Each structure stands twice: as structure tokens, then as C-alpha cells.
């Protein structure tokens, strides 16, 4: 997953532009107060489609949601260890300041002349451009509870119910804050999260994290998961669809935000690899090579449910008829010590204006989805991702 540009010793893009003279252009704590997908022109990212333009941290909505997918994702879930609202507001202000610089490829802070002090920025991206870095933040219902803000919890912000067949592990379940860092370079994404966490070390600890990757090619093809099937074909792709499916239109502090359903899905690759092609395709209800639904020729042809096995993944998901925006990444963490097999799977991320959309889909999949023979849901969380930040403002200020 190493980007060729990472090893390029030539002058970086930002330095070239400078030399050429071109130049680059309360937390609701006050709370009262994919093929076509990769071509969508989200307002915060429409200049980033060539892979070389920065993605602004500021805007009506947070970047990293409808933003065209990047090649790498570093996701971390954090536990909060303060009940002081003022401390959390300051943390979110600091994160806003850091994030606005990180997405532009700048140091989080320039250091003084005292070499006996640790550098403020860890420095592993010096000389690199931002590689379309986006940073997305969300909070859980437990976050509100810890700060005595349960009365500010939106009605839609309900806990995810138990689902059939899941085997959730405590270490991958729950948490108070999520940070999703995506970029076209793995080290850039990690650097961003590392420095954000470093800034808040006296208030937060890491609960769990995963480094993900996506085979997005030139962004014109839907990425494939580790089972070799295209993942995200049915995604919504237009601004009109985003308003209908992704962005909340509530009158509370979540207006303009989105709910992230997060699932850590372990994929049993060795079992899958021993399964014949016909059975694999029956599991999905799509042809493996083309991604077309059964009975059709093209990936994006309309699905005819009558042509799909009754327990196929696509049929069960389509029966609910509630679109969501999938933004998932594959992961591989070496070897599972218990089994000696690959510890690999999917960081399933779905955004929607109402979490009930995801709940209804997953409930329909839970008991009879043939996919359950090859996967196990081991982690879960639901996070409210704020609306975007205007310049001069800070995360969660609505």
C-alpha cells in the first residue's frame, strides 16, 4: 500500500508551487445554543479529484464523508477521561487548529530554537504533500453522558441494538470519540491521528484503532473487498442524494452532520478461499468479475430480486430499500494467534442521516445472510459526526 510518491526524492508539490510563484490558495457542549461515487463533486472536495489538490477542513459538512475515497484510512476510537466541558471545548479547538494545518501539509506548530525540547510535530510527513488528507470526527452517546449532556442527545441518536450472529469483543465496542483520517498515503493518515492524539493525551486514551486500505485505482472503479467482490456499488452519488440520505436536517446541533455506523468485521479468508466460484457468487448475488447482479450484464444495472438467492447478501440488503453511504476499508493485521490464519477483514463504515437505516438493513441481514458463514462482526459503534466547521469556529460549536 506504499504510494510511489512517498519514495520520491524530488521537490514536493508545495515547494514547487512556491518557487514557481503560483501559491496555494460550544462543541454542542453549549449544545443548547462506487464508481460514480468517486466522481461526485462534493463542495469541499471537487478540486481534489485529480489526487493532488488539498481537501479543506472547513465547510458546510465535514470532509471524509462524501469525499471521494482515498487509498488509506487510519481510524481510531478514543475514551474520554474528563468531565470538564471547558477542557473538552479547548481540546476541540486545538484539534480544529491542528486539522486545518494537517490537511494542507503544514506542521501542526513551528518550534522555537530550543533543541532540548521535543518537537511539537512528530515530523514523519516533512517533505510530503497532504495526499488528499481528510479528517472526520464523531462522538458517541457515552460522550454526552460523561459530560452530563444526556438531555442534548438527539432523538435519532439511539444505541445500536444487538444483531443476530455478532460476536462483539469489548475492546472493539463502544468508545467516546472517533477520528477517521483518510489519505492517499498511509503515513500521512497515521501522522495526522498521531499528532491529534498527542495533543489530547491528558484527556483521552486510545481504545482501538485499525489501519485500512482500498484498491481504488484511478477512482473510476468500485473498490473490491478481500473476498474479491466490488464493495459500494449501490452507493448514493449526487448532492441531491446526499441531502436525502446522508446529511441530517434536524433542528438540533446535529443539523448538517451525519451518523457513522462503525462495524469491525473479521473475514474468514481461508474458508472463503476453499469455496467454489458459484457458491461465492450465490453468497453475494452478483457476478464476481463484473459486479453485475444476477441476470444482468453491468455492475450498475438495476437489481431484479427474483433472480437472486433468497439468502444472498445483496437481496437481503435491497429488500429493505433504505440507501446508505458505505465508506469501508479492508484491513490486515498479520496472523490470528488463536487460529494461525489471517487476521483480516473490513472496517465497515456507513454514513446516514438516521441510524435506523443501518439498523433495519443489518437486522434483515443478521439471521439468514449467507455471508455470515464467512464473516464475524467483532466490533461496533455509533457516532454522531458534527456538521462542518466554518473558519474561525471549532468542532462541535453548533
Question: What residue spans do the PLM features occupy?
Answer:
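N-terminal secretory signal peptides
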Residues: 1-15
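Long, histidine/aromatic-enriched segments associated with O2/redox biology
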Residues: 18-34, 45-398
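Short hydrophobic alpha-helical membrane-entry/anchor segments
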Residues: 39-41
Amino acid at each position: 500500500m506504499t504510494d510511489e510518491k512517498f519514495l520520491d526524492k524530488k521537490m514536493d508539490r508545495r515547494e514547487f508551487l512556491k518557487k514557481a510563484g503560483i501559491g496555494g490558495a460550544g462543541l454542542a457542549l453549549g449544545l443548547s445554543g462506487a464508481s460514480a461515487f468517486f466522481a461526485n463533486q462534493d463542495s469541499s472536495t471537487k478540486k481534489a479529484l485529480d489526487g493532488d489538490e488539498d481537501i479543506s477542513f472547513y465547510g458546510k459538512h465535514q470532509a471524509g464523508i462524501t469525499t471521494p475515497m482515498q487509498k488509506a484510512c487510519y481510524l481510531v476510537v478514543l475514551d474520554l477521561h474528563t468531565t470538564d466541558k471547558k477542557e473538552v471545548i479547548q481540546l476541540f479547538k486545538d484539534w480544529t487548529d491542528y486539522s486545518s494545518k494537517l490537511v494542507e501539509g503544514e506542521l501542526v506548530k513551528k518550534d522555537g530554537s530550543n533543541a532540548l525540547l521535543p518537537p511539537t510535530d512528530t515530523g514523519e510527513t516533512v517533505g510530503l504533500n497532504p495526499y488528499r488528507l481528510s479528517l472526520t470526527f464523531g462522538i458517541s452517546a457515552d460522550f454526552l453522558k460523561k459530560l452530563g449532556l444526556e438531555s442534548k442527545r438527539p432523538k435519532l441518536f439511539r444505541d445500536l441494538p444487538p444483531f443476530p450472529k455478532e460476536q462483539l469483543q469489548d475492546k472493539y465496542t463502544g468508545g467516546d470519540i472517533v477520528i477517521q483520517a483518510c489519505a492517499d498515503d498511509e503515513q500521512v493518515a497515521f501522522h495526522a491521528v498521531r499528532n491529534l492524539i498527542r495533543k489530547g493525551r491528558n484527556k483521552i486514551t486510545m481504545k482501538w484503532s485499525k489501519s485500512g486500505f482500498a484498491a481504488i485505482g484511478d477512482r473510476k472503479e468500485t473498490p473490491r473487498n478481500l473476498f474479491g467482490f466490488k464493495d459500494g456499488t449501490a452507493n448514493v452519488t449526487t448532492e441531491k442524494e446526499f441531502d436525502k440520505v446522508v446529511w441530517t436536517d434536524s433542528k438540533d446541533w446535529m443539523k448538517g452532520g451525519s451518523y457513522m455506523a462503525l462495524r469491525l468485521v473479521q473475514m474468514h479468508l481461508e474458508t472463503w478461499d476453499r469455496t467454489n466460484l458459484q457458491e461465492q457468487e450465490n453468497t453475494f448475488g452478483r457476478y464476481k468479475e463484473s459486479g453485475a447482479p444476477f441476470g444482468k450484464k453491468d455492475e450498475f444495472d438495476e437489481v431484479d430480486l427474483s433472480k437472486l438467492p433468497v439468502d444472498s447478501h445483496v437481496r437481503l440488503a435491497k429488500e429493505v430499500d433504505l440507501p446508505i453511504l458505505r465508506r469501508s476499508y479492508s484491513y490486515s493485521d498479520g496472523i490470528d494467534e488463536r487460529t494461525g490464519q489471517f487476521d483480516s477483514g473490513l472496517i465497515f463504515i456507513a454514513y446516514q442521516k438516521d441510524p435506523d437505516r443501518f439498523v433495519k438493513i443489518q437486522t434483515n441481514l443478521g439471521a439468514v445472510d449467507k455471508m455470515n458463514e464467512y464473516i464475524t462482526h467483532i466490533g461496533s459503534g455509533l457516532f454522531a459526526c458534527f456538521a462542518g466547521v466554518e473558519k474561525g469556529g471549532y468542532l462541535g460549536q453548533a
